[in-house]
Amino acid sequence: EHPYLLTYTSGTTGRPKGVLHVQGGFLVSITREVAYQADAHPEDVIHFATDMGWIMGPWMVVGGGALGCTLVFAEGAPDRPADRLWRLVEAERVSVLGLSPTLVRALLPNGDPEADLSSLRTLVTTGEPWNPDPYRWLFEQVGGGRCPIINCSGGTEVGACFLSPTPAIPIKACSLGGPALGMAMDVVDPAGNSLVGTGEVGELVCRKPFPGMTRGFWRDPERYLDAYWRRLPGVWVHGDWASADQDGYWFLHGRSDDTLNIAGKRIGPAELESAAVAHPAVAEAAAVGVPHEVKGEVAWIFCVPLPGHEPTDELADEVAARAAAELGKAFRPDRVVFVPALPKTRSAKIVRRAVRAKALGKDPGDLSSVENPEALEDIARAL
């Protein structure tokens, strides 16, 4: 129980939280995950495209180090030049590669990798929900159609993953498999009733303790209790929308505090963003809810266009029409705004709360975790 690691959350929902982990629990949880979910062995070479400020940095160091793997570090941005990551894999013969969906979406417009990626055996992804096209590209063009995508999700405060597939079982595209080893996970409605197996979207919760869980927030115990323990008695409420289908596969649908409520119909930003990114001219998207006198709330989608595509009213209409076709007319975005970039944390997560604040002309609050705050000024100018 001796303190081991003080690390900070991404800050996507507010001021970053200082998370305290201890020696035994963190080591056990991370090593178990790298060994049995990423299927790493002593002879493997691991590289996770991250900096040490994201929990996936310690994930690689602690788990990979405990297993005796070779660890590859790289300074600077993984996409400058555009093929840098693929050349690194080729040069170091990386076999376990970790990266975020956001990074994959940024790399995809540069074309298929030309480097020799035959050393790859496992792909590990985390950070945000997937869109089908980038997921398929990663599997087919990076992994050669042979490397499993271990799409996992947990959090800085979890000290491991709540949900994760393993290479030993079939994987459904964009899913997270199911509960990670030792995790008593559930999806519940507002009353706490289980929705697992129904495919309905509910809150992701954990019903039993686990070794890697944080011992609390640094000098802020009340915030820790408010964040996870005071919404449903006796369970950890993680703040993610999730579903588990009849085949036993689990999916995430974005943060529950990012949910839009359009004319009484709830939808997560991930669904709207996925529909927007499916347009061949859109690289990235962030969907936020904006107050509306009649509907209560409408969706605005902020899109980053792919190189070679000029933002026009016609293109905005096309993106909105695609969203309506995929999700229903009720969810057609009220506005599509093109911007050069979206504000992101150092772990490549889009800071939707800041996007929404700018859309409403409000103070975006704590931006200490935002790597490119200038993107918010671009948003303000675009409006």
Which residues make up each language-model segment?
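Conserved AMP-binding/adenylate-forming
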Residues: 121-123, 130-249, 256-259, 272
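AMP-binding/adenylate-forming catalytic core of the ANL superfamily
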Residues: 90, 97, 210, 215-216, ...
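Conserved pre-ATP/AMP-binding loop-to-beta segment of ANL
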Residues: 1-8, 15, 23-25, 39-45
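Generic structural signal for well-ordered beta-strand positions
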Residues: 17, 195-197, 251, 351-352
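Conserved AMP-binding/adenylation subdomain of ANL enzymes
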Residues: 27-45, 55-95, 110
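Conserved helix-loop-beta element of the AMP-binding
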Residues: 44-47, 72, 95-98, 112-133, ...
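Conserved S/T- and glycine-rich ATP-binding loop of Class I adenylate-forming
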Residues: 3, 9-12, 34, 46, ...
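Glycine-centered tight turns that cap/initiate beta-strands
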Residues: 2, 119, 223, 281-284, ...
